[in-house]
């Protein structure tokens, strides 16, 4: 994907993050390194740095079946951070740093930030460091249902400023002017991913009929190692 896009769009840049679930109530476990969003590489023009992060991702296990996809998409698009126990103090085991620290982030600007000035390329928008005037696109993949704070059938920790739900994801991606491309490895998440694509206008003409009305949700049937190779 990266190689093909670089040929078509020479100035395209890339970032990378992972997500498991909240380390709370058996959804995920801090002992396994589970978190709802982990920025691995901010948007950069250095594709080798992205490759290195993809290659070195450790195995996390989560707890129950759903995953924190909604929170991850929200943090990726919004980038304001998350304080799971609402104590205003950043806890590396459970919380998410804002991309850019400020007085109005959940830690009052004292919890650090995801942004690094040493990384080349990128910008300061969202939770990945999207560039001004670039088209932000988040490609996300999962094999599980999307834990949704707007759906009472899913439990969430009750963190600050709030646990992310479908509405937050749609609003943040829309405000960013971005797209979300979903990749599923099982049928359980299809409906939720299609709802996100529809609500954010993440559509294209993928069937060649001349109409940009196909939802950007795709099925992946290869291995995880194949996926890493395909991305880079």
Which functions belong to the PLM regions below?
Residues 1-232:
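Divalent cation-coordinating acidic motifs and surrounding scaffolds
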